[in-house]
Amino acid sequence: MTEVGVIGGTGFQPGLPERRRTVFTPYGTVRVDITRVGDHRVYFINRHGKGHDLPPHRINYRAIVWAMRELGVKRILATNSVGVINSDEYEPGDIVLPVDFLDFTKRRPTTFYDEKVVHVDVTEPYCPELREALLKAADDLGYTVKEGAVYVATEGPRFETPAEIRAFRKLGGDIVGMTGFPEVVLARELEICYASVCLCTNYAAGIDDRRRTIDEVFELVEELRPKAVELIERCIEYIPPKRSCPCSQALEGAEV
């Protein structure tokens, strides 16, 4: 039986619910919904909390990822809402698997290693095995899922300016969001595989002439949510029992 963690927003819980558990971590308590997909146990954490009351810059990312570790999770699948920067390749309604990121967050804690020196390698930040499983699941379901994007992480809670988006585009950014970082790095620091399923909900500022509103974001999230949940559920069936990716040896040679 593979134990999988899923981090997402309200309504993204996969599988059949079984029970709820509170996990105590050095960084705070985390409420976890335990579900089952086939023979696999799934631990779901709503990163925004009950009622979506936590903005992106106040989410306790370290507690969330540490809770997954406490539960014995070795694979994490996350969902993230994003805006489209590279309109030549992506558009609202797309589901995208990022392969790299640019970090433009400012104040949130981004590491577990404040007391010792650890330089974890993130040459391939998103687990290749999980991405492959997601692509197999998409093919099985007949869904179009695009891979290869560079995710730009911003602090929030405000949307980005057109000037920022132009700069991100020049730096190679394809999509932009507020919740995908530092989860990806925190997972790597604990040698947990991590992949993100990004839901393109709108064009970023300046890409079109429309004003950004949270209503349009939530509207498209609701449209994409059933497909994303089904994709994750099918992906879980394709995850191999044993890991052969570099994520499981991320700390080898990393500590000074």
Curated annotation (Swiss-Prot):
Enzyme class: transferase
Keyword Transferase: yes
GO BP term, example: purine ribonucleoside salvage
SUPFAM superfamilies named in the record: Purine and uridine phosphorylases
TM region positions: none
One GO MF term attached to the UniProt entry: S-methyl-5-thioadenosine phosphorylase activity
Reaction equation(s) it catalyzes: S-methyl-5'-thioinosine + phosphate = 5-(methylsulfanyl)-alpha-D-ribose 1-phosphate + hypoxanthine
Pfam family, any one: PNP_UDP_1
Cellular-component GO terms for this entry: cytosol
Site (Important for substrate specificity): E160, I214
EC number: 2.4.2.44
Residues annotated as binding phosphate: T10, R47, H48, T179
Keyword presence, Glycosyltransferase: yes
Amino acids binding substrate: M178, N202, Y203, A204
Pathway(s) where this gene product acts: Purine metabolism; purine nucleoside salvage
Alphabetic keyword roster: Glycosyltransferase, Purine salvage, Transferase
Additional remarks: Although this enzyme belongs to the family of MTA phosphorylases based on sequence homology, it has been shown that conserved amino acid substitutions in the substrate binding pocket convert the substrate specificity of this enzyme from 6-aminopurines to 6-oxopurines.
Biological role stated in the UniProt entry: Catalyzes the reversible phosphorylation of S-methyl-5'-thioinosine (MTI) to hypoxanthine and 5-methylthioribose-1-phosphate. Involved in the breakdown of S-methyl-5'-thioadenosine (MTA), a major by-product of polyamine biosynthesis. Catabolism of (MTA) occurs via deamination to MTI and phosphorolysis to hypoxanthine.
Assembly: Homotrimer.
Recorded family membership: Belongs to the PNP/MTAP phosphorylase family. MTAP subfamily.
Protein name (database record): Probable S-methyl-5'-thioinosine phosphorylase
Organism (species): Methanopyrus kandleri (strain AV19 / DSM 6324 / JCM 9639 / NBRC 100938)
